[in-house]
Structure formats: C-alpha cells, structure tokens
C-alpha cells in the first residue's frame, strides 16, 4: 500500500500557501516542522473550552486539565517505550532538557578530573551545556572526530573512554548531515566503561520508532515542534533510578512538597520536582495530538516513504553541476549542500524566490562547519509531507541558479 502523501498534505494548511507567486515547497522541517489541523485544533479546543491551571485545583476544569496533561505523559511513555510515565519530564525543548541534565545530574556527578565525551557533529545544544559544566567542575570535554563522509571515527571511542568518563552525549541523527549514528553500540561501550549516555533525539523521533529500553540509554530528549507538535514543549526521559536521585534544578511552585521559612523546603518526587511553575499545558495537549497523528499513520510507513523520497532526491541532485553534498550516502531527513563557490545565503535566497524553503547557515553546528572548512551550508529537509515534485523544484531551482551565477 502506497503512503497517502496527498492525504497527509491536506492536513497541513500552510502547504496551500504561495510564496512569491509559487506554491510553497517547505523543505525546512529539520528546523521546525509544520503542524497538521489535528494538532492546531487540539490546542485551540483546550484553550477555548478546557483551560485552567493544573495541579491542586479542586474545580472541574483544573482537575480535567491536570488529567489531560498526565494522560499525555503516559502517552509519551508508550511512544518511547519507557518503563514508566514517571521517567518523563516535560521541558521547553531539547535544549532545556540537556541543560536540565547538565545542571542537575551533571553538577552532582561530574567533578574535577572527570571527562565527558561528545562528537564533532553535535548541535550547539549538545555542546555548550557540557562546556559550561566542564568549566564549572574542572572536568575535561573529549570529542569523537568525524570522517570526511560524515560518519564518526568510532574506532577512537575506546581511547576516549576511561574510568573517569561520566557521560557520553551524542546525537541520534545529525541535524546537518543526516548521519544515523549507531547509538546502541555506543551506549553499550559507554556502559562497559561505567559512563552514562544522553541521546539527543531531536532529529530522530519524527523519522522512525524509538525504544529507549532497547537502546538502554540513560537520558533521551526531544522537541515537540520537530514532531509536528507545538513550539515550547519537549520531553526529557531519564531512567527512573537516576531521575529520582537527581536534585532539583529550578525552584518555584509545583516542584515542592513543603516550604517553611524556618525549616526549609522539601521537594516533590520526580518528575514533578523538575517542572517548576505553570507548565505549557496547551503545548502538552498539542504534543499528544502530534503523537496520535504520526502513530495513526505508522512510523514504519513514514520511515519507508521518507527513505524512498531520500533516494529519489539524492539521485536527482546528482545531476546538478558543481553541487557539493555533505554527509553519508545512507542518511535520514536532511541533505546538506553547497553550490559552487556561492554562499549558502545567496543560494537560499534564490530558492526562496522560486518558492522553495531551505535552511542556510551554520545550523548551530559551527565545529562541523569548521571541519568541512565552510562558513555555511544549505540544508533541505525531507519529511512525510514532502513529494518528488517538490524535490524536482529544488533541483530545477539549483540548476537555474548555477546557470545564472555560473
């Protein structure tokens, strides 16, 4: 049975837009995905008919909103195959989730003489918090280097791991190169060395099924807005024994058990002690609707369609003169490229004139740009609502730019 891409596209109202007099070809979902009507409607319905502050409310609307929020926590647990919903913390997104780990678990567990291992392909969100932790603690930051083809030099991992390695933090799929890292293998090696592992799943959850128990990762984090959900909501998964031992990061309402000016404060159990203040309940409701949406389509069917679309795109882009592609042949979700000696911003601006939206810049991955010795790249994203016709428009646009600019 073929993937119902036209039916899917009909659920995304923005895809009916025109840009510069041409139909929008939105190839920027790796930055942020568009939202289907089902997500938009779910959040609107909540604000129109069901909104109230969650926790401790005796009235019906508050109790209902609290229950709906906790139902989504249970839903996310099933989506990730977590053992318990109490292993999941609602955060603003991947960046906040990583910072939470660095500032709670990291401050308690990482000390002078210890080390943290990351990779050369990481998003800044999975670099800077660890740099800051190392500066605070006196720990060392170690880096798994890249190969030119965009894969990791995994043969270097054994030499980087030792008895003082506290954490390996790695992206599951590169936001620039589309490299799908062998995270299960890396997790197993890290655990043999006694280290914990954090997986940045921001570029993975929309492309295929995630099973945190099978991966055996200690931390897993993703953002809702890349999963066709709202902005400002994400999820941090932490193995229950680790999460219950972590000290709170932010103080305020909802994360306490008792507060006394003379006796001090006691804290709620996890995950609620990591959710200070009024949560983004509307965003949580929207995230639940997004998970419903992709689950109904089936992540296996989505993965199969996207893999076919990627093969088509790579074959067609091979016909563009002076086009440099970055990353491995086997990639997921994104294609990074430059056209001749033209700056990525110029290429992206021309493509926008043709109604084709791509991302340009360093993609929050400046160490990766330094490795390839370029200031910027263009990046086209391919997801479940994209089509071969949109790929054709990208290729035609690139050929036209090459002809115009030489």
Curated annotation (Swiss-Prot):
Q: How does it assemble?
A: Homodimer. Interacts with SufE and the SufBCD complex composed of SufB, SufC and SufD. The interaction with SufE is required to mediate the direct transfer of the sulfur atom from the S-sulfanylcysteine.
CDD domains, A to Z: SufS_like (cd06453)
Membrane spanning residue stretches: none
Instruction: Please give the organism.
Output: Enterobacter sp. (strain 638)
Subcellular location, in the record's words? Cytoplasm
Active site feature: 364
Q: Which NCBIfam families match?
A: PRK09295.1, sufS
Catalysed reaction(s) here are: (sulfur carrier)-H + L-cysteine = (sulfur carrier)-SH + L-alanine; L-selenocysteine + AH2 = hydrogenselenide + L-alanine + A + H(+)
Q: Identify the Pfam families for this entry.
A: Aminotran_5
Assigned keywords, A-Z: Cytoplasm, Lyase, Pyridoxal phosphate, Transferase
Primary role: Cysteine desulfurases mobilize the sulfur from L-cysteine to yield L-alanine, an essential step in sulfur metabolism for biosynthesis of a variety of sulfur-containing biomolecules. Component of the suf operon, which is activated and required under specific conditions such as oxidative stress and iron limitation. Acts as a potent selenocysteine lyase in vitro, that mobilizes selenium from L-selenocysteine. Selenocysteine lyase activity is however unsure in vivo.
Q: What is this protein called?
A: Cysteine desulfurase
Q: Quick check: keyword Lyase in the entry?
A: yes
A Gene Ontology cellular component where this protein is annotated is:
cytoplasm
Q: What does the record give under GO molecular function?
A: cysteine desulfurase activity; pyridoxal phosphate binding; selenocysteine lyase activity
List N6-(pyridoxal phosphate)lysine occurrences by residue.
226
Predominant location = cytoplasm
Q: Which GO terms describe its biological process?
A: cysteine metabolic process
Cofactor(s) needed: pyridoxal 5'-phosphate
Hey, which pathway is this one from?
Answer: Cofactor biosynthesis; iron-sulfur cluster biosynthesis
Member of which family?
Belongs to the class-V pyridoxal-phosphate-dependent aminotransferase family. Csd subfamily.
Q: What is its EC number?
A: 2.8.1.7, 4.4.1.16
